[in-house]
């Protein structure tokens, strides 16, 4: 999945850092209000709703793509806010099918429909269960952001922190649990108004190292989204319904491409560097050669690797999941970094169980060698996060080449007695 880390220096919390939700913490009712947990409409209505939304929102294209997408997002969010989450997701599917150009903003749109859903410790798990892993699990992330955002300024009891995800434990599909814990990280950044240090401390209140690291990934995804809005004027991220960081929040330094990773405690640094490419690439105008050089300056070999993995994830997104575009970007970095770039790409291609075949096909398109082996190791890491039992992991690692299988099962931790993932 993704990994992130703490920010070394942030301004003290203030409502200025949470400009986009001014007044929300002054709404006590939001802390006890919830969307209905029983849908009132069925997914079969999605086609008609999608057609209606597309017709109503098309005129906004003349103003900007952001206005067009925001119009669609508002319409879908109106469905989910009323408890019709599956219908909202189905409508998003139909919209993307009708206008494939929107696939690149499918995650922000799913995030927006999730953020529209209010929940309480009693209802959060039931509402989250209506989401799934489509669109890089944006629905989960949005619901959890709203859950914590609504509680800004209130004490965060341990029961409130744990309630959303504890109901998802004990299943074979542990990816749902990862998604929830990752979403908690997003939400904690809302709660703490972009103070990553405070957010990470709350992540450390979770039960296990795996839980905590899954949470870190959400904290620093949110940090980097805030940095994009703050430094690079990325309007598209507004569809996530993120608050806008205030000018006093130091989320990134363009003259120091290793910040904030080089200013964070060692425990969080690996997660940070896995996401640092999200900040490096816009700073170097998407020049993968220059971005690779920035990764090389991370110092520690493990951190350099994580940075290259992040470059691969970005390559997959920038190429709209097209294999040729991924290879073109990854092949610009140093020869030692290319295999790890491929690993990052496949972990993005196969971000969720429903996308596993797409990642496997990418690895099979590569020639035998280090790049292909590292790609299959990346598949294994994903598989280890998707399934908790060895049988399912072995089944997912099938390939015609024994070398593929060996790399995959090693990544999945099939022969180990410890969880395959010690990080998200």
Label every model-predicted segment:
Residues 11-18:
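Boundary at the C-terminal end of the N-terminal hydrophobic targeting segment
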Residues 18-424:
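Non-catalytic tandem-repeat scaffold regions and their flanking low-complexity/translocation tails
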Residues 1-9:
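Bacterial N-terminal signal peptides
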Residues 9-11, 34:
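Intrinsic disorder/low-complexity segments, especially N-terminal tails and targeting/processing regions
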